[in-house]
Swiss-Prot record:
Keywords: DNA replication, DNA-binding, Primosome. Gene3D superfamilies: 1.10.8.1180. It holds the Pfam family DnaT. The gene is dnaT. This is Replication restart protein DnaT. Residues 156-179 are annotated as: Disordered. Homooligomerizes. Interacts with PriB. Component of the replication restart primosome. Primosome assembly occurs via a 'hand-off' mechanism. PriA binds to replication forks, subsequently PriB then DnaT bind; DnaT then displaces ssDNA to generate the helicase loading substrate.
Length: 179
């Protein structure tokens, strides 16, 4: 049986029993590995070293900062089950993604900052209704997540500009240009 000794100081159990104070006083770091029949039996620790170890353990048990994570990150949301068609189905007008859609999208590698807007969902449903393809509910959600990712990134995350808005020229002259 192999074992790892965590201190360079090793002593037999008989030597420790005979004169424990001298053995511990000579110990480097206040710890001695005690062997019995050429096998490690236990560690002998000085009171000062034990106090250091207990203080270190107490320090490590306390949180390193006062920042606490939201419990919501650790708990699965308990939502009422929604009647989702079993198996594959074609897109229908009242289809909705799950309540925890943003969390699921993150699991699929799509980071969404805000939930699906009614306009985005309506556009997605209208497109896929016309296509007439059939997928499982989870696949529809994955398609919606990818669609949102691509749609929102196409304009650098900014909302689409209204094409009917008349632009107004800037009247300021940049530094370095003559006016």
């Amino acid at each position: 049986m192999s074992s790892r000794v965590l201190t360079p100081d090793v002593v037999g159990i008989d030597a420790l029993v005979h004169d424990h104070q001298t053995v511990l006083a000579k110990a480097e770091g206040g710890v001695v590995a005690v062997f019995d029949n050429n096998a490690p039996a236990f560690y002998a620790v000085t009171p000062a070293r034990l106090a250091e170890l207990l203080a270190l353990e107490e320090k490590l048990a306390r949180p390193g900062s006062d920042v606490a994570l939201d419990d919501q990150l650790y708990q699965e949301p308990q939502t009422a089950p929604v009647a989702v068609p079993m198996g594959k189905f074609a897109m229908y007008p009242d289809w909705q993604p799950d309540a925890d859609f943003i969390r699921l999208a993150a699991l699929w590698g799509v980071a969404l900052r805000e939930p699906v807007t009614a306009e985005e969902l309506a556009s997605f449903i209208a497109y896929w209704q016309a296509e007439g393809k059939v997928f499982h509910h989870v696949q529809w959600q994955q398609k919606l997540a990818r669609s949102l990712q691509i749609g929102r990134a196409s304009n650098g995350g900014l909302p689409k500009r209204d094409v009917n808005t008349v632009s107004e020229p800037d009247s300021q002259i940049p530094p370095g240009f003559r006016g």
